[in-house]
Amino acid sequence: MSTPPPKLLRALAGETLERPPIWFMRQAGRSLPEYRELRSRAKDFIAFCLDPEMAAEATLQPMRRFPMDGAIVFADILLIPLALGQDVWFEAGEGPKLGELPPIEALRDQVEASTGRLSAVGETLARVRAELEPDRALIGFAGAPWTVATYMLERKGSEREAARAYAYAHPDELDALLDVLVDATARYLVMQAKAGAQALKLFESWAESLSEDVFERIVVRPHAAIVEKVRAAGVTVPIIGFPRGAGAQVETYAEGVPVEGIALDVQATAALGRRLQAQGRCIQGALDNLLLREGGPALDARVDQLLAQWGDGPWIFNLGHGVLPDTPIENIARVVSRVTGKPVR
């Protein structure tokens, strides 16, 4: 008898399951003591991400601790600009820093070689797939072009205003940068699928505060182009798009980007999720990560509410944003147990 596909892949294929599959963004990270110990052994964060042994271990740590249905490869969205030739480093307490943005032509010249420079991520995926149980799905990911471009332009990880202003003042230059990132990102995702990723996710962390025309130009169009390129390369694994902060424009995104799954943030209404499900889309989300951190009866009530409002359609239980570093492990265990019905030690 053949083994059925993992629950997560069945949901992305449009199935309504007896319970939603579950995984959390940033489930591997500083909320886990074993992660903090592992991270202390690396000289810096970029080296940590590009060490397949360490990155594979970080990916697997939450899978050993919790009965999650999906493992997301441990990496970072800023590996793409690094591979394209822009300096990237992380400073303690300050987050990412980036060097001067190279000329567009210089970036374009590096696209073909960029995937090879990220081969360590492929090795990480292969290592994880070899150890991960067959009923648990392995997820690859990349930052979406606009989000990555904001870091490349701002050269840090805080404000977005300068990048948004650049989108208005220099539309042709931004479009050229996004085109480079579309090509590099599609190649990177294809590599991840070939290395063992069974689903792929595009993180558009900064889809908020964009007018309708700009949203179409710098979010919808690049995402659709990436999906087209990935499919043209023969990759058939499901893709999840995450236009975080898009609000009502999530439906514009759904109309324009042919992804199998759409991740929702905490703004998403029950009705929005149900409309997407009725269109045959799998939705993912959307527990508030702050509520996960705070815990208590309100957490239980919200989990139950989400199960009731979206449980009758294809849905993956997740957060609206990543696990916060100071989230108590017992709160994560509590939610996972409540959703899966499995005890968590």
From Swiss-Prot:
GO terms for biological process: protoporphyrinogen IX biosynthetic process from glutamate. The keyword Oxidoreductase does not apply. It is found in: Cytoplasm. GO terms for molecular function: uroporphyrinogen decarboxylase activity. Gene3D superfamilies: 3.20.20.210. PROSITE patterns: UROD_1. The keyword Lyase applies. GO terms for cellular component: cytosol. Pathway: Porphyrin-containing compound metabolism; protoporphyrin-IX biosynthesis; coproporphyrinogen-III from 5-aminolevulinate: step 4/4. The record marks 76 as: Transition state stabilizer. It catalyses: uroporphyrinogen III + 4 H(+) = coproporphyrinogen III + 4 CO2. Substrate binds at residues 26-30, 76, 151, 205, 321. Pfam families: URO-D. It is an enzyme of class 4 (lyase). Its main location: cytoplasm. SUPFAM superfamilies: UROD/MetE-like. Disulfide bonds: none annotated. It comes from the Bacteria. NCBIfam families: hemE. Homodimer. Catalyzes the decarboxylation of four acetate groups of uroporphyrinogen-III to yield coproporphyrinogen-III. Belongs to the uroporphyrinogen decarboxylase family. This is Uroporphyrinogen decarboxylase. The lineage of its organism: Bacteria, Pseudomonadati, Pseudomonadota, Alphaproteobacteria, Caulobacterales.
